[in-house]
Amino acid sequence: MAAIHFQMKRAPAALPRGLADAVRDNARMNDTVPTIRLRNAWRGSHPWIFQKLVDKPAQRPKPGSIVDVVGVDGTWIGRGFYNGHSRIALRMLEADPGVAVDAAWFAHRIGEAVRLRREILRLDAVSNAWRVVHSEGDGLSGLVVDRYDDLLVVEFFSAGMYRHREWIYDALRHEFPDARFYSFADEHVQKQESFDYRPVSSTGATPEPAIITEHGVRFRADPAGAHKTGFFADQRENREWLSHQVEGKRVLDLCCNTGGFGVYAAVRGASEVVGIDIDQDVLDIARGNAKLNDVRIRFVQADIFPWLRDAANAGDAYDVVILDPAKMTRDREQVIPALKKYLDMNKLALGVVKPGGLLATFSCTGLVSEEQFLDMLRRAGYYAGRTLQVLKVSGAGADHPFLANVPESRYLKAVFCRVLD
């Protein structure tokens, strides 16, 4: 069987203060963890192993339990989380049989993620808002942590991370001693992973929003009031790049959410900025973000489909159009309908771009590949009767790393086009 590589071997890490007792309390667990056997030969390196490949254990561990995994012939595979209720039965974490997955393991892995951002990427020089942990990209399948100044927002995508959340909190406190915490899990994830969890704040109340700065532009990050973790730091470099193309131009920000692209554009000297979103709550936050930066933006609550048709019929056109819709689907069987919706909205968006203008279009649907998205855009240009010159293709910032063997982690597609005619 081929060697399995879920993480690099490491030297023992020094325990953060407060974790020593947790390690002693849980030392026996990793000595006596249940063993899960695969039913077929397995030569993969992806950290997910699906239910159909796993023998059902006689005594099923609780969802999110740490287990040892062996092949059909008893050969060691690795150590990870087991969930007999989820489509993803195993989330592999550790390939070294000599390394326990315990509080010290989490402290080391989270510490490495923080050091990547601070010492290699040097993100503190750019912003006080960045992704601390990006799930599989940082070897922590099912965990996302975002930093917004003094507020850490923790999102659980697996029962295993939820079950071991105290280890996670302790490790984060070591790296960010003065941080506030807000943690939650999407209802769909809870149902899929078989656990129940209500949002929790370390202060015991709804957390106060954090004021963040990136590339000199200020925003309010509000995990309790906005979508996902409260702000989309993944678009930081895309916002910055596009903002240098907008001086003196009319800008339309579709699906504007809390105003990220639009606020950048206004700060960088756009002559006019219009933001459209169907969600009044996020528009209220967007107006606050414009006020934070002392810029004027016209925000409109509307469904972009009829709004764009009306704008095109009225001959309204913009120099720069941004289209950044929410995730379309979690289901592989719904990818084709999702692509059809992307096609329809991009075709309409192209109808309000001036000749020679720019279209910045995005997809955060991980199941839609970059190739599929570019093909959709080609067809949108054809049906709209517009010729597209692609200037730049990118994705999320470097604080959202992905493993080459886990393409699902590379979820964001960003395409910047010039509309030639």
Can you annotate each of these PLM segments?
Residues 272-277:
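Conserved SAM-binding motif I beta-strand of class I
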Residues 281-319:
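S-adenosyl-L-methionine
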Residues 133-146, 162-232, 240:
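Non-catalytic substrate-recognition/targeting regions of SAM-dependent transferases
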Residues 344, 358-421:
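C-terminal catalytic and target-recognition region of SAM-dependent MTase-like enzymes
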Residues 6-8, 16, 22-149:
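Non-catalytic accessory regions of SAM-dependent methyltransferases
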Residues 258-271:
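Conserved SAM-binding loop of SAM-dependent methyltransferases across substrates and taxa
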Residues 248-255:
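Conserved class I S-adenosyl-L-methionine
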Residues 282, 318-348:
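Mobile active-site "lid"/loop adjacent to the S-adenosyl-L-methionine
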